[in-house]
From Swiss-Prot:
UniProt-recorded name of the protein: Probable translocation protein y4yR
Keyword Phosphoprotein in annotation: no
Family matches, as PROSITE patterns: FHIPEP
GO cellular component: plasma membrane
Sequence ranges of Polar residues compositional bias: 680-697
Region ranges (Disordered): 675-697
Source organism per UniProt: Sinorhizobium fredii (strain NBRC 101917 / NGR234)
Any one GO BP annotation for this protein: protein secretion
Topology term for the membrane: Multi-pass membrane protein
Transmembrane segment boundaries: 20-40, 42-62, 67-87, 107-127, 200-220, 235-255, 293-313, 372-392
Length: 697
């Protein structure tokens, strides 16, 4: 016997699959074959031990996924317990005996009173059925539903983190497997709780069958008196019911513990999790101790008991307080070397405003920051980019009354601002008629008035700008000019992350063919020409269509512009009309022939006289537009458009250059002139500046 037991203990751990199969076969056998009384005692003990083991395992797992086999274990345990109930019922009815465990348990619980035993059984069964099983069933049902509903969002989040480089492919597969396992676990637990609930109902039915069957057999077959039959079979029936319901109760607690777990990042077991959260607030512990002390003074309550409990709560609060204080000291303690080490890795602000010390008191700092914040919101809404916070600091090195605007730590603008003057926004005639003294600056075309005349300006209804508003306007110009510098790989990732919430398939398709640095390059090129990227969907759709066919980023940007033609025309036109200077075909050929291909990329190399002629004409276009009028665009072919635009930008001329592919069908072109250059080998005649169009009248 000892050798057989030793061989079994060596064989079982190595073959758990066979042990499960053996357990199921044993359960089926118990339903159809008579079992010796000694074997029934052993199986009852095994059933109790298995229930206790499952409960302990559920208490000590860190996450429900660590015990994902629980639904299957519930099924096996329920089948085994029901088969054991069938076996004990057969023994009770056939032999009037069910083993020493059932007899002893029944005698102990009944304590000589049948009613007591029956009531205890009903209480245990109702607690299991109405409270534990029903509550756990509802939790499992809701958890399964919510887990399945959240599954697509979690999968998209994993895809986004993988694309953004936050996790690798192995981690992505691991997380996907965990998600799949979690969804299957909660779905299976939803069904497994039906086993637990049905088990408690079966216990009520079985006790009735055993009582009625036992009394009938005792009276009719064994010739026992009614009192003997009632005592004997009631003792065995209640003992059998309780010995079956207690493991079922433990299994209900196990299942309820698993489905009600809320796993945190620390991944503690249930006891540690509860202890940490209950003792997290020392104030709560001390208040509970005070309440217990007060309850001890209620007449009839045992004062020593409540005092002892209050002392335990108070001691726990003081111990926890000491631990928290020690943690705070450890967190705030740094070595002298650490405290004196400068933050050499600090990155400069993308955009910063610096004032001379004399301006800090002369300009309202709160008003200035409000104006800058409003300007940032306007630029963000106009261009579709995220404008970072713009700090306003003091630079002791700046001369008096000067300010400086830095972009990525490099000064891009530095000028003088007079805090005692206001800039007027109305026309000159209105100001002259008001009689308020002013000064006109012919270089900037601004009209200045001393700040002391501000009440008179308000009374006359003349619009004006304060020094803080003027400075905010300079910030606006800087933001618009340097918007491409605010869009990098990180900002592109954030933009795609926001788009993925609504257009997940589109983002996935774009990232399949286009790396993020390339997308960022396209966005910067668009912003560099003042094209907003608010409608990111159009940009991504054009990238998805053209990225595989066009590897050149500059040409890819041209195709993206074609996809945004309506937005481009709306930006430069008015009332569906685009005034345009058209570049003649011969001039386009001159530009086309002047493009030089190098390893660093193509560039435009016009002859000096051609450059001068083109600049002369463009400056006439630029200066011919009166204030308030729509500035004409320059219209040319797609292949030379970016070279013409780059040539103008390098020479300080901000004119929109559009290709024919940028024109939307619902906008009309109003030619106002043509642009013509002499051929590269031409020597005769002076170049004509601008040839007016015959349609302009």
């Amino acid at each position: 016997m000892a050798n057989a037991l030793r061989r079994f203990t060596e064989y079982a751990p190595a073959n758990p699959d066979l042990m499960v199969a053996l357990m199921l076969l044993l359960a089926v056998s118990m339903m159809v074959m008579p079992i010796p009384v000694m074997a029934v005692d052993a199986l009852i003990g095994f059933n109790m031990g298995l229930a206790v083991l499952l409960l302990m395992a559920a208490l000590y797992v860190s996450t429900p996924l660590d015990f994902s086999s629980l639904p299957g274990v519930i099924l096996l345990s329920t089948v085994f317990r029901l088969a054991l109930t069938v076996a004990t019922t057969r023994l009770i009815l056939a032999e009037g005996e069910a083993g020493s465990i059932i007899h002893t348990f029944g005698s102990f619980v009944i304590s000589g009173n049948i009613v007591v035993g029956f009531v205890i059984f009903l209480v245990v069964t109702m607690v299991q059925f109405m409270v534990l099983a029903k509550g756990a069933e509802r939790v499992a049902e809701v958890a399964a539903r919510f887990t399945l509903d959240a599954l697509p969002g979690k999968q998209m989040a994993i895809d986004a983190e993988l694309r953004n480089g936050h996790i690798d492919a192995d981690e992505s597969r691991r997380r996907r497997a965990a998600l799949e396992k979690e969804s299957k676990l909660y779905g299976a637990m939803d069904g497994a709780m039906k086993f637990v609930k049905g088990d408690s109902i079966a216990g009520l039915v079985v006790i009735c069958i055993n009582m009625l069957g036992g009394i009938s057999i005792g009276l009719l077959s064994k010739g026992m008196s009614f009192a003997q039959v009632l005592h004997h079979y009631t003792l065995l029936t209640i003992g059998d019911a309780l010995i079956s319901q207690i493991p079922a109760l433990l299994l209900s607690i196990t299942a309820a513990t698993m489905v009600t777990r809320v796993t945190g990042a620390s991944k503690l077991n249930l006891g540690e999790d509860i202890a940490n959260q209950l003792t997290a607030s020392t104030r709560a512990l001390r208040l509970a101790a005070c309440v217990l002390v007060a309850m001890g003074f209620v007449p009839g309550f045992p004062l020593p008991v409540f005092f002892m409990l209050a002392a335990v709560f108070a001691a726990a609060s003081f111990v926890k307080g000491d631990v928290l204080d020690a943690d705070k000291v450890d967190a705030t303690t740094v070595t002298p070397a650490e405290s004196q080490t400068p933050n050499v890795a600090a990155q400069p602000n993308p955009i910063g405003v610096f004032l001379a010390p004399s301006l800090t008191n002369a300009i309202d700092q709160v008003e200035l920051r409000q104006h800058i914040a409003r300007i940032s919101q306007l630029v963000s809404a106009d261009l579709g980019i995220i404008v970072p916070p713009i700090p306003v600091d003091v630079d002791q090195q700046l001369p008096e009354s000067q300010f400086r605007i830095d972009v990525e730590g490099v000064p891009v603008e530095q000028d003088l601002i007079n805090p005692a003057q206001l800039s007027l926004a109305d026309d000159l005639k209105k100001i002259e008629s008001s009689g308020i003294p002013f000064r006109h600056d012919p270089e900037t075309h601004r009209i200045w008035v001393e700040q002391s005349h501000e009440p008179a300006l308000k009374a006359a209804g003349i619009r004006h700008h304060s020094p803080s508003e003027l400075l905010a306007m300079r910030v606006h110009a800087t933001l618009t000019c340097h918007a491409p510098r605010l869009v990098g790989i990180q900002e592109t990732r954030q933009l795609l992350g926001r788009m993925e919430q609504e257009y997940s398939d589109l983002v996935k398709e774009v990232l399949r063919t286009t790396p993020i640095p390339r997308i960022a390059d396209v966005l910067r090129r668009l912003l560099g020409e003042g094209i907003p990227i608010r409608n990111t969907r159009l940009v991504l759709e054009a990238l998805a269509e053209w990225s595989e066919r066009e590897q050149n980023v500059a040409l890819l940007t041209e195709h993206v512009r074609s996809g945004m033609k309506r937005q481009i025309c709306h930006r430069y036109g008015r009332h569906g009309v685009l005034p345009a200077f058209v570049m003649e075909r011969e001039t386009e050929d001159v530009v086309r022939c002047a493009v030089r291909e190098t390893a660093a990329g193509p560039y435009l190399a016009l002859e000096d006289r051609q450059s001068e002629a083109l600049l002369s004409q463009m400056r006439q276009v630029f200066s011919s537009t009166a204030p308030g009028q729509t500035r004409p665009i320059v219209l040319t072919s797609m292949d030379v458009r970016r070279f013409v635009r780059g040539f103008l930008t390098r020479n300080g001329i901000e004119l929109a250059v559009l290709s024919y592919q940028d024109l939307a069908s619902d906008f009309k072109i109003q030619p106002v002139g043509s642009i013509r250059l002499p051929p590269s080998n031409g020597t005769s005649g002076e170049p004509r500046s601008i040839r007016p169009s015959a349609t302009t009248g």
